[in-house]
């Protein structure tokens, strides 16, 4: 276990508290599908939850203020033909969400400003390229409209959502199922955890493995890997004796871990959630009833145990609110959305402070919703750090969090065009090039011209026949 050494840390007294029953989301049938994803995604406007659905896959999108009992007839996002396995909100548009499914597709949806009024079955775009179920979807942190997906076909595809095209395909880097993928701070690298017990750091644009570690965790159960803001990689997994482990790795010297800790013998996969502003990692085990949190520092033992928040009920999944959605007036440093079997329960983490003033040390400038790069720039090789915003003035819950729109989102353009036209609202990644469209149009115009000529000649013939008939009658 962890040595409880008394050390100076402003997060030693982080206090966790579940909200009251009337502030939970009740009567929700959380998905029972066997896949180790979080099943929940949250942003400052909505909470999305993967739910049970007959005849396909669905997830529910609720405005944050829509607490209490949720009606069984409440609309869902239900375009997939197989169970939904993973969902992820776009960091640059709080109304755009991506979903991956057992039906081998990735779909991108645009949720109305005030939430769903009727069920949504037509996505903005369908991304087709995987041959097996899609278990991971994750947006690029700094480039607009760049989305990564990973399937049980052991492939990673990076898409330009604005055009519906697959731009990068990593086919030969993983021999088995990919459990998790995480972008680094500026989105230039990804780290992956695979069933072959290896963690890999990959440059996706060069399609090169920068670093890899075999048997990062020797147990057979799934691993997870995330990037920290300093470039190190934090992993969770299982030892050979089936003990749950966490480890810290430096990709520049990945042969030996910077730190390794054994935790317990529970068999639930540990989902890590990371706050780059405070360097705190929260571990939520599927099937656990607790959230453990650790501070990562440059001093040995590098991973410092802070505390554990425990409730009575086990968790089926967990959502983690981005920093810009927190209540800074209450010194809230994290908010989780815990999935039970039939409800979603928000859990608030606060650092008790006597002063009512804004706590600069708890809230350094954080990543905002503006994207420093367009998709095309990133694919051309440019990198950009997150555009930071101050939380000093906080946010009003429920208000639109798109602080500034530098350029109109391509997704919005696609949505408006789709609603104007009579064609279906979704467009597959295998869309016909414009040159072919022009050729087809020319062909159609020629056909119309020949039909007009045919009609004209037939009219003349009919006229002559009518004339002959009238003479015969006389």
Swiss-Prot record:
GO biological process: actin filament organization; endosomal transport; endosome fission; endosome membrane tubulation; membrane fission; neural crest cell migration
Protein name: Coronin-1C-A
Function: Plays a role in directed cell migration by regulating the activation and subcellular location of RAC1. Increases the presence of activated RAC1 at the leading edge of migrating cells. Required for normal organization of the cytoskeleton, including the actin cytoskeleton, microtubules and the vimentin intermediate filaments. Plays a role in endoplasmic reticulum-associated endosome fission: endosome membrane fission of early and late endosomes is essential to separate regions destined for lysosomal degradation from carriers to be recycled to the plasma membrane.
Sequence ranges of Polar residues compositional bias: 418-435
Gene3D superfamilies: YVTN repeat-like/Quinoprotein amine dehydrogenase
Disruption phenotype: Morpholino knockdown of the protein causes subtle defects in mesenchymal cell migration, but no gross anatomical defects. The migration of neural crest cells towards the pharyngeal arches is altered, resulting in no clear separation between the first and second pharyngeal arch cells.
SMART domains in UniProt: DUF1899 (SM01166), DUF1900 (SM01167), WD40 (SM00320)
WD repeat residue intervals: 79-119, 129-169, 173-212, 216-259, 264-304
UniProt topology in membrane: Peripheral membrane protein
The keyword Cell cycle is annotated on this UniProt entry: no
Assembly notes: Homotrimer. Binds F-actin. Interacts with RCC2. Interacts preferentially with nucleotide-free and GDP-bound RAC1. Interacts with VIM (via head domain).
Any Gene Ontology CC annotation: cytoskeleton
Coiled coil start-end: 434-468
Keywords: Actin-binding, Cell membrane, Cell projection, Coiled coil, Cytoplasm, Cytoskeleton, Endosome, Membrane, Repeat, WD repeat
SUPFAM superfamilies, per database record: WD40 repeat-like
InterPro entries on file: Coronin, DUF1899, WD40/YVTN_repeat-like_dom_sf, WD40_repeat_CS, WD40_repeat_dom_sf, WD40_rpt
Chain intervals for the UniProt region annotation (Disordered): 415-437
Stretches that traverse the bilayer: none
Molecular-function annotations in GO: actin filament binding
Family, as annotated: Belongs to the WD repeat coronin family.
Subcellular location: Cell membrane; Cell projection, Lamellipodium; Cell projection, Ruffle membrane; Cytoplasm, Cytoskeleton
């Amino acid at each position: 276990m962890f040595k409880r050494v008394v050390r100076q840390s402003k997060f030693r007294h982080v206090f966790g508290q579940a909200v009251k029953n009337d502030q939970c989301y009740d009567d929700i049938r959380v998905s029972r599908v066997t896949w180790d994803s979080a099943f929940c995604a949250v942003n400052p406007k909505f909470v999305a939850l993967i739910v049970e659905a007959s005849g396909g896959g669905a997830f529910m999108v609720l405005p944050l203020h829509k607490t209490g009992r949720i009606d069984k007839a409440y609309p869902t996002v239900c375009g997939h033909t197989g169970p939904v396995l993973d969902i992820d909100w776009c960091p640059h548009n709080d109304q755009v969400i991506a979903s991956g499914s057992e039906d081998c597709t990735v779909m991108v949806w645009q949720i109305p400003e005030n939430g769903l009024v009727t069920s949504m079955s037509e996505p903005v775009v369908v991304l087709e390229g995987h041959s097996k179920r899609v278990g991971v979807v994750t947006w690029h942190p700094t480039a607009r409209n760049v989305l990564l997906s990973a399937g049980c076909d052991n492939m990673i595809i990076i898409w330009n959502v604005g055009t519906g095209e697959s731009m990068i395909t990593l086919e030969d880097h993983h021999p088995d199922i990919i459990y998790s993928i995480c972008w680094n701070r500026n989105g230039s690298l990804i780290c992956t955890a695979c069933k072959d017990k290896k963690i890999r750091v990959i440059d996706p644009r060069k399609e090169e493995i920068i670093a890899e570690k075999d048997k990062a965790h020797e147990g057979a159960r799934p691993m997870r890997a995330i990037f920290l803001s300093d470039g190190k990689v934090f992993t969770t997994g299982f030892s050979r004796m089936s003990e749950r482990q966490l480890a810290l790795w430096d990709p520049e010297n990945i042969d030996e871990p910077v730190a390794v800790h054994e935790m317990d013998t529970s068999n639930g996969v540990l989902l890590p959630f990371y706050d780059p502003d405070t360097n705190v990692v929260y571990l939520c085990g599927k099937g656990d009833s607790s959230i453990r949190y650790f501070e990562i520092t440059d001093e040995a033992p590098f991973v410092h145990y802070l505390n554990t928040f425990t409730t009575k009920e086990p968790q089926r999944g967990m959502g983690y609110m981005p920093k810009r959605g927190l209540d800074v007036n209450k010194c809230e440093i994290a908010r989780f959305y815990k999935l039970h079997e039939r409800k979603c329960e928000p859990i608030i983490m606060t650092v008790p402070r006597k002063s009512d003033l804004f706590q600069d040390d708890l809230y350094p400038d954080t990543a905002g919703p503006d994207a420093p790069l367009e998709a095309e720039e990133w694919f051309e090789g440019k990198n950009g750090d997150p555009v930071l915003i101050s939380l000093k003035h906080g946010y009003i819950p429920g208000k639109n969090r798109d602080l500034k729109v530098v350029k109109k989102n391509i997704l919005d353009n696609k949505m408006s065009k789709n609603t104007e036209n009579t064609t279906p609202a979704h467009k597959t990644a295998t869309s016909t090039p414009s040159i072919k469209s022009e050729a087809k149009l020319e062909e159609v115009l020629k056909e119309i011209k020949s039909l007009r000529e045919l009609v004209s000649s037939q009219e003349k013939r009919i006229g002559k026949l009518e004339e002959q008939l009238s003479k015969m009658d006389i």
